């Protein structure tokens, strides 16, 4: 509930993965417990299937372990060898960003979110297209 009101919120949390034993996944589980104890609904969105069934909507384009995401990571931080030139890299990045943006927008809309919490996607440079989307 919002302090002093009876309003329940629909809260979304996004990360590359959820339901795992890494620090971010564990913190997301803690946050969910707190939010739910206050009467809110919590929705998880992740790129990799969770280790346990926790109601996470899986968006494969959000996974950082796929070859497309790894190639974008290399192109952003190391070399354009996977693409040949900057134009091809930019086109691949734009396609990935558009796909993720569409997928995330559909999830946000279908979950009727009031609040969106983005976990580490902007602070960990594993999936540049996810950071842009």
Model-predicted segments: where are they?
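Nucleotide-activated donor-dependent transferases that construct or modify glycoconjugates
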Residues: 4-21, 115-122
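A conserved catalytic-core segment of Leloir-type glycosyltransferases
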Residues: 7-8, 34-115
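Short catalytic/ligand-binding loop motif for oxyanion handling, primarily in non-cytosolic enzymes
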Residues: 21, 51-54, 124-127
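Short amphipathic alpha-helix
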Residues: 24-35
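Surface-exposed cleft-lining segments at the edges of enzyme active sites
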Residues: 89-91, 120-123
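Charged helix-capping and loop-helix junction motifs
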Residues: 129-133
């Amino acid at each position: 509930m919002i302090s002093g009101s009876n309003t329940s919120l629909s809260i979304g949390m996004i990360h590359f993965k959820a339901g795992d034993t890494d620090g971010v996944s564990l913190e997301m589980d803690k946050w969910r417990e707190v939010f739910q104890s206050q009467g809110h609904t919590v929705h998880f969105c992740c790129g990799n299937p969770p280790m346990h069934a926790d109601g996470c909507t899986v968006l494969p384009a959000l996974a950082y372990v796929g070859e497309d995401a790894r190639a974008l990571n290399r192109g952003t931080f190391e070399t354009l060898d996977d693409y040949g030139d900057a134009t091809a890299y930019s086109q691949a990045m734009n396609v990935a960003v558009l796909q993720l943006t569409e997928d995330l927008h559909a999830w946000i809309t279908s979950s009727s979110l009031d609040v969106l919490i983005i976990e580490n996607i902007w602070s960990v440079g594993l999936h540049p297209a996810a950071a842009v989307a």
